[in-house]
Amino acid sequence: MSLQRLSALRALMASQPTALAAYIIPTADAHNSEYIAPVDARREWISGFTGSAGTAVVTSSSALVWTDGRYYTQFEKEADLSLWTLMKQSLPDTPTMEKWLATHLAEGATVGADPHTMTREEWTPLQTALTKAKMNLVAVPTNLVDEARVQLGDPPPARPHHALIPLPRKYTGKPAGQKIKELREKMAEKRAAALVITALDEVAYTLNLRGSDIEFNPVFFSYLVITPSSTYLFWGDGTIPEEARKQLEDEDAEVEGRPYGDIVAFLQQLALAEAGDGQSSIWLSSDASEAIHRAAAGRDVLEKPLNLTSEVSPVALMKLIKNDIELEGFRQCHIRDGIAVVRFFRWLHEQLDAGEEITEIQASDKLLEFRKDERDFMGPSFDTIPGAGPNGAIIHYKPSREGPQTVIKRDDMFLLDSGGQYKDGTTDITRTRHMSYSPTDEQKSAFTRVLKGQIMVGSALFPKGVKGNVLDSFARKALWDVGLDYAHGTGHGVGHFLNVHEGPAGVSWRPYPHDPGLKPGQVLSNEPGYYKVGEFGIRHEDLVETVAITKDSEHPRAKYLVGDYDGRGILGFNTITMVPNQRESIDVSLLDDFELKYINDYHDRVYNTLGPILATRALIEDKDWLERECAPITRK
């Protein structure tokens, strides 16, 4: 099947007005979304690789995918390796896509791509590199993978257009009209005639609306354009439903609906209108697509295209700092989510102890049942990763519902990464447990070293404004001490009933390109790991909120403070995830006294928070199980 698809694509490449020597197929959709709808799953369709990150390149004789360390094992399982080559992104011996194209194509070659699926930040350096190599990059007006699908009788599904969900102020904490007012103030500072918002979560955040067009992400396909006097929502056929319109009006947000497909023509007309001004510009996010940049600059309608303001979106920076209502929502939904996860683990241990066969899929489905019992639950925040035994070493493992199912065994390390979308927040938690409470010495050592790294980040104090990459090595030190590591970042931002992965801040060995620095009110993940391919995987993941710290704060390191970084201010983290780590998998001999107390204090907080709720709900078996799991750990 993959060969047939490649052949169809190659025929289309050869039939272009200027034959294409290579065609680039990114993962992203027209909004640079991490998670995409089936209509946009072009790289998956052509390659068979389902990972959420990666770029495919097809030439007349080669087919390659560049992806990062989270997906190496997954790619080798899913792709036809007789047709596709894995390019292990960021490894020293792996050339970048630009370098590979420059060295493997002939001088004068033309490379094509759909400008809707590449950001301006991706397009420009690629164009520069190819020009330097005396090659051309062209914007192909129609997507060739979509055309290949039609030719093979497998057309892309329709783009979803589901109902809009108004999110009341009791959850958002700030009305849409106030957000638009603040954005207009930012626009005035930039002398911007318009702000073009293309990221789906940014549109949803600004308008206090949610949707369900992309699985796990409560967003809707749309664009938002704000001018000094008007706001335009490009969505569906342009008709804003009555319930959504009423909330917008109640929140002093006057929004005019336009058809989703009209955005390019609208921006071209806007460019024509602004062409004679010379004093103002149009502001786009640097993550907006090349197609949107072309339209806003008027490249196809003006002799001299407009200069654009292209930088990080002000909406991204606004929603990064959660307000008090959003932060309290995060804390409360993590309590409810903790109840669901605790109930699940007690159930799973009970089933396996009784000799029942439980597959990874069955476990995932049961966890969803428990989450559905909790107030304001709207669905999972991503596809649950239930990695039993060697599957836990596949960082973004996804079991198939078709074919043989993996049974969770009592001698397995079981890595469970899952999360929920609630109206008052988003959760993302990973816990790793040995299903018979008897891990090997190697597993205990790895488990404990990963936990030590998580504690080092979770208990860290640092100056306000420090970027996340500074903290990344904290999480790795205990692993590095014995020559171990993990091939992913340590933390990502999390949206408020929005995308579980939210920029522009994060904690990774590689700096986030637009990281504004750590500030109070951010919510991030703290998730070091270790993966022994073919045997087991370990990851501990909590969500933390960034908080201001003084000597009087209830923080385990506050009492040691003697300064405030020369007036810069002190920050730390408060862990909001509420699920214990498995005591039996901890090698106490590897812990210092601070770490041991940190774990016991955390478990005490978890039990004192969740225990009374379980008792009130008459979930006595769950309460008793939690009490045992949170019992103090002592040195023998």
Residue ranges of predicted features:
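Active-site neighborhoods and metal-handling regions in enzymes and metal-associated proteins
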Residues: 1-636
